Amino acid sequence: DVYKRQNQDEAVVTPLLLPDTPLVAWWPTLCPPDPASSSVGKLAQRRITNVAYDGRVTGEDLRTLSAGYTPGDSDMSWAAITLWRGVVASALDRHPHEPVQSVEVAGPAGHPAPDFAAGWLLDRLAVPVHRTVTDSQEPHFPVTHLRFNRETSHVDVDVVDERTVRVCVP
């Protein structure tokens, strides 16, 4: 197994490092279950994985990666929804400012971005988050629908096409 050659990895990588330069480790395909504990991951301040590299992500893959999470870890699927997260934050920053009671997140089963989005919203809002599966194959916006349920109104963020996201606010 490639991750069991710990002494070899460190011996090869260490001489290439510049002193006082932050190190980022990137696994573009298969990553170790606990990137921060791997030989290269121990040397890095940031660790970037790509759990969706082969398009066959399972819930078990996400649970394994989540169990090994350490501050400084990130995934390309999380980075892929950066603009979407900005739209979501902007949508919530509009009147009326009511507390969110629950959230609905939808996206394709085989893409981890909707799961990352649901986890982020659960962590930030501390409200129930319901994840539904769609048959959409829109690669540019893997989170195809989002609804913030509030007492008197809802906020919806929907993908219209590869260039358009519709935000419906009261």
Give the label of every model feature segment:
Residues 2-3:
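Short, small-residue-biased leader/transition segments that mark boundaries at the very start
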Residues 7-8, 113, 140:
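Short, glycine/acidic-rich beta->alpha junctions
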Residues 10-85, 89:
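Contiguous mid-protein beta-loop-alpha structural module that forms a pocket-lining wall or clamp
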Residues 16-19, 96-98, 140:
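Flexible, charged surface loops at secondary-structure boundaries
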Residues 46-47, 56, 63, 85, ...:
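Arginine residue identity/basic-tract feature
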Residues 77-131:
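ATP/pyrophosphate-binding catalytic subdomain of soluble kinases
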Residues 118-120, 130-170:
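C-terminal structured domains
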